[in-house]
Regions:
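Pre-NBD coupling/linker segments of ABC/ABC-like ATPases
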Residues: 2-64
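Coiled-coil-like amphipathic alpha-helices with heptad-repeat character
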Residues: 16-18, 41, 51, 57, ...
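ABC family nucleotide-binding domain
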Residues: 64-285
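Polar low-complexity intrinsically disordered regions enriched in Ser/Thr and small residues
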Residues: 9, 46, 54, 83, ...
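Conserved beta-strand-loop-alpha-helix hinge in the C-terminal portion
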Residues: 284-306
Length: 306
């Protein structure tokens, strides 16, 4: 994230879960979630940034219970005698199968919102329901369980263990979940194959390109079969060509597996791949923008909304 000017605002640091935080507490939530029906054709849109063609997956129908239901969310940090209001009553709903970008300038509160949605922090006020369960006031152990079962994290810096293979990096969350060695290897191989690295199992991070390292990180995020992925600037360390490949991988996970994917990003090109962009400013949702799918069905829906 970019540094803020003037007073340092803590919300611009997304807290990355420590290794211990990945340990699994007793079962609380059932991570099984039905895939939304994806019957519409893909829509080809033009990037708002450079005019290149982007294939955008049509948004699923917003039916049933939201995966994420944030209502009047507030977060205040105390710094000496000064209070910093990172969130001032933000409200948003995200439904199963959506691919959403959260954008805003430095100090807007978007990273604080991401931390709370990712169960890495708790709000000072308001309610956050994850799959219908109020997680706003859960204990650290139960939040750790939700992180390990329900949420896959992908960060800009990859966060791979440098001395271990791609396979071992992907297996790591299963070690803390108590999964047997044979099952760990089987699931890690499947996860790496899913992201196109089935032939790189024994390679260490320094033997992989930046794009391949991020694919390993995505495979690790998928290993516990989460309900959603939270990605913080996932293409920030990648060149343009590799960024496009990674975003297309995210799209395939969204389209083919019904994965709910949420990005925090400064990059308009990353947002262009999403179906929806939530703009945060001064701790509030300033605008919730549904991007137009240029397939005939997508255009028909856009006209209906208007």
């Amino acid at each position: 994230m970019e540094p803020t000017n003037g007073v340092h605002q803590p919300e611009e640091q997304i807290v990355e879960p420590a290794t211990e935080q990945m340990k699994v507490a007793p079962a609380l939530l059932d991570s099984t979630q039905a895939d939304p029906v994806m019957t519409e054709p893909l829509g080809v849109a033009k990037s708002a940034v450079n005019g290149t063609a982007i294939t955008r997956t049509p948004a699923p129908e917003r039916t049933g219970q939201p995966v994420i239901d944030v209502s009047d969310l507030r977060k205040t940090y105390t710094m000496g005698e000064m209070e910093v209001h990172a969130l001032r009553g933000a409200s948003v709903k995200i439904y199963p199968g959506e691919m959403v970008a959260i954008m805003g300038p430095s100090g807007s509160g978007k990273s604080t919102l991401m931390n709370i949605v990712g169960c890495l922090d708790v709000p000072s006020g308001g309610v956050y329901r994850l799959d219908g369960i109020d997680v706003s006031r859960l204990t650290d152990d139960k939040l750790a369980e939700i992180r390990s079962k329900k949420i896959g994290f992908v960060f800009q810096s990859f966060n791979l263990l440098s001395r271990t293979t791609a396979l071992a990096n992907v297996e790591l969350p299963l070690v803390y979940a108590g999964v047997t060695g044979r099952q760990r290897r089987k699931r890690a191989e499947e996860s790496l194959s899913l992201v196109g690295l089935g032939d790189r199992l024994d390679h260490k991070p320094n033997e992989l390109s930046g794009g391949q390292q991020q694919r390993v990180a995505i495979a690790r995020a998928l290993i516990n079969r989460p309900a959603m992925i939270l990605a913080d600037e996932p293409t920030g360390n990648l060149d343009t060509k590799t960024s496009k490949e990674i975003m297309e991988l995210f799209q395939s996970l969204n389209r083919d597996r019904g994965m709910t994917i949420i990005f925090v990003t400064h990059d308009p090109e990353t947002a262009d791949y999403c179906q929806r962009v939530i703009h945060i400013r001064d701790g509030l949702v300033e605008r919730d923008e549904q991007l137009i799918d240029h397939s005939p069905e997508g255009l028909r829906k856009a006209v209906q909304v208007l």
